[in-house]
Structures are given as C-alpha cells and as structure tokens.
A protein has these predicted regions:
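Short, structured active-site "lid" loops
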Residues: 47-74
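Small-molecule-sensing regulatory modules
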Residues: 1-39, 44-45, 52, 128, ...
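Short, well-ordered beta-strand segments
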Residues: 4-6, 75, 93, 121, ...
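A conserved helix-loop-strand patch within extracytoplasmic ligand-binding domains
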Residues: 79-82, 88-138
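Paired acidic/hydrophobic, glycine-rich loop segments that form the ligand-binding mouth/hinge
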Residues: 68, 73-78, 160-165
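Short glycine-rich, flexible loops that bind phosphorylated cofactors or substrates
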Residues: 83-84, 171
C-alpha cells in the first residue's frame, strides 16, 4: 500500500513535505510514499492581506478536505500557518525537530543597507508591530505570495527589505540571502515557527511515524499554541510565542497585544515540560491581566 502525503504546491511546502517523507523512509525503508500537491485558498488570493481576507484555515481547508475524502493520508504543514484549533477528526500526530525559529532581514540583491524611501515588506501584523521598535524611522508594508514571489518583488525594487522566517529560506537553500537574524529577544517568532506538523484523519495507522517526531518540539508547540489560543488569537493575529526546552524544563516567552494595539506586554514563564499547555495558558492570563511578568 502507498501512503499519500498531502502538501501545498509551493516550492517551500513541497521541500518541507519531502523532509518529512525522507524521515519516514529513514525510519521505515519498506514504506512506499507519494506526494499529492494542491493550491489552498490562501495561495489563490494574493491581492489582499490575510487579515483582510479573514477567516481561519486559509492555508489548510483544501488539505483538510483531502484527508477526509482519502486523497491524502497525512498532510504536512508549517505549524505557524495552522489554525490554533484543529478539527477533532483531523488530529496533529507528529512534530518535526525545530529548524531555526528566528525571523531574518533580507536586503535586495546587491544592496548593503536599508533604503529609507521604501518600506520593509512583511506578511504579518506580529512582525509589523515589533519592527516599529527596531526601525522607528522605517515604514512597513504587507507583502503576499510564496517566498520566491516575495524575493522577486524585493529584487525588483518594491521594498527596502523583507522580513522572513529563517527556516523557510534555509529549507529552500537560500540561506545566503539572509542579511541579519533577529534574536527572539528582538523580534519574537510566531507560535510554532520552524516546526513542521503532520496531520491525519482519526483512525489512521500511525506506525509509519514512529521515530519521526521530536518530543521537545511537541512540548514547545503545545506551550506556544496554548498561549495564543488562550488569548483568542490565530495564525494571523499579532501575538507571538516561543519556547525552549532544557532537559525536563520548558521556558516560554510570549507577546501580548491588546485589541486596539495600545498595550504590548512581553513576559516569560518556566516550568516542567510535561505541563506545557498549562504553562502557556498561565502566561497568557498573566500578560493579558498586566501581571508581574516582564511587561513593557
């Protein structure tokens, strides 16, 4: 029997799916795999920002349907693009080892510095809000499309720079385009950034995933997503969360942004990694209520 892996059809999505497929083949050489690609709603609508399109699951609806009707047995997602709530019949069953979680700055080819006359292109409110503190004299502007499309827009002169996820550039072999990395203390990543998630339908045989997932990445994912979920946020909201694991201890840093964007607080909590979800919920409550965490 051949196992069908569903993916968005962008070059990055395919590269990510192939990484998961390679991991399955290494752990289970006897398993036969095939890749099934498709366009999602978020891939088709490129003339508006994600916030303007509205709704959840812009990059997953078609993949979810493929799981339900049997066109795919598993789907691979960049975890940061997944809605915080996933359908009960379509559980997340594995999380990859985390690639570089940082955001990075990319200048046009041949440029040595930012052009103050042009905006910095970024795809999320989360990045826009944090960039204001880093580059107070620069404007930001939304940019849509896959990574290669965005880079073409940058190199054609539309933007002074782009802010992108380092993991995506590395997975595409484009690490050389990175001008500088933003430490999480400067620009807190999106929940799940750098982690790939495997989703399936209830009742599927999961034996082919044995040895594929990373337990520490799973704990980080649970904490980060619990934080965002507790604040009522989604994959397009400006809140951010990033967790690290040392031994049995998990440290979570979160960014809270009020609805009118006048209050921005950042704070951290540390606890046992088996309590990842409750840690995320507790930090969300503390920051939303203006607790003693490192609010700013």
């Amino acid at each position: 029997m051949t196992i069908k892996i569903g993916s968005r059809e962008s070059k990055l999505a395919v590269a990510q799916s192939e990484l998961i497929m390679d991991a399955i083949r290494r752990a289970h050489p006897q398993v036969e795999l095939t890749l099934v690609t498709m366009k999602t709603t978020g891939d088709k609508i490129l003339d508006r920002t994600l916030e303007q399109i509205g709704g959840k699951g812009l990059f997953v609806r078609e993949l979810d349907q493929a799981l339900r009707d049997g066109r795919a047995d598993f789907t691979v997602h960049s975890l940061k693009d997944l809605p915080m709530e996933t359908p009960e019949d379509l559980p997340l069953v594995a999380f990859s080892k985390r690639e570089d979680p940082r955001d990075c700055l990319v200048l046009p080819q041949g440029a040595a510095e930012l052009d103050p006359k042009k905006p910095i292109g970024c795809a999320s409110k989360r990045r826009q809000l944090q960039l204001k503190a880093l580059y107070p004299h620069m404007d930001t502007a939304p940019v849509r499309g896959n990574v290669l499309t965005r880079l073409k827009k940058l190199d054609s002169g539309e933007f002074s720079a782009l802010v992108l996820a380092a993991a995506g550039l590395k997975r595409l072999g484009l690490e050389g385009r990175i001008t500088r990395y933003f430490a999480p203390t400067e620009l807190l990543p999106a929940a799940g950034q750098g982690i790939m998630a495997v989703q399936t339908r209830k009742g599927m045989d999961l034996s082919c995933l044995a040895g594929v997932g990373d337990p520490d990445a799973a704990c980080c994912a649970l904490a980060e997503r619990a934080f965002v979920r507790a604040l009522g946020g989604g994959c397009t909201s400006p809140v951010a969360a990033h967790a690290t694991v040392e031994g049995e201890t998990l440290t979570l840093t979160g960014l809270y942004v009020s609805e009118d964007e006048t209050i921005i607080r950042r704070g951290s909590r540390t606890g046992a990694k088996q309590d990842a979800e409750s840690l995320g919920e507790a930090l969300a409550q503390a920051l939303s209520q203006g607790g003693e965490d490192d609010a700013r």
